[in-house]
């Protein structure tokens, strides 16, 4: 619960406050936003290719994954997520587009829309947010949250999967 409150505060703090100090929040693309986006994409690609060692490299073990659906919210630790993902033979594939990345110092947020496929078939889409921090000079995902909408509410600009 404490992490949820902190995460909500961070999102609130990024959107409010004295605008004269907000010029240090970066919304345009630069080397830092590119490196943050790269970490998120690498993590998702590693999950999609079942390379859990590579995925774990980009994620803090102590963090959490939150799923928000019409029937409520659930969460689990990053460790639990990787254990469950590694124990399955399901083929995952996720694509993201139009990420919005903000950072200040060693804290960053990446917000994106995505679609998700299981065993080569479209499953769902939604919005996904990642909270990252810089640890020993490299960006790592602390927590991430996503909505999981039913297929009829999805409009991916990426078209069908090309194998």
Identify the role of each PLM range:
Residues 14-49, 53, 57, 161-162:
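Short, low-complexity N-terminal intrinsically disordered segments enriched in polar/charged residues
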Residues 38, 56-94:
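Short solvent-exposed beta->alpha transition segments
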Residues 43, 54-56, 63, 110, ...:
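Hydrophobic pocket/interface hotspot
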Residues 59, 69-71, 112-116, 128, ...:
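A mature extracytoplasmic/lumenal domain signature
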């Amino acid at each position: 619960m404490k992490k949820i409150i902190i995460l909500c505060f961070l999102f609130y703090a990024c959107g409010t406050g004295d605008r004269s100090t907000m010029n240090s929040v970066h919304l345009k693309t630069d080397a830092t936003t590119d490196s943050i986006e790269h970490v998120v994409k690498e993590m998702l690609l590693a999950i999609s290719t079942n390379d859990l060692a590579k995925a774990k490299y980009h994620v803090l073990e102590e963090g959490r994954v939150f799923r928000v659906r019409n029937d409520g919210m659930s969460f689990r630790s990053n460790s639990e997520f990787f254990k469950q993902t590694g124990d399955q033979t399901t083929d995952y594939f996720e694509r993201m587009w139009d990420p919005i990345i903000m950072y200040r110092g060693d804290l960053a947020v990446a917000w994106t829309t995505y679609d998700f496929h299981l065993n080569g078939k479209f499953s769902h889409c939604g919005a996904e947010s990642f909270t990252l921090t810089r640890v020993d000079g490299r960006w790592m995902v602390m927590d991430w949250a996503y909505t999981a909408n039913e297929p009829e509410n999805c409009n991916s600009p990426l078209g069908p999967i090309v194998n």
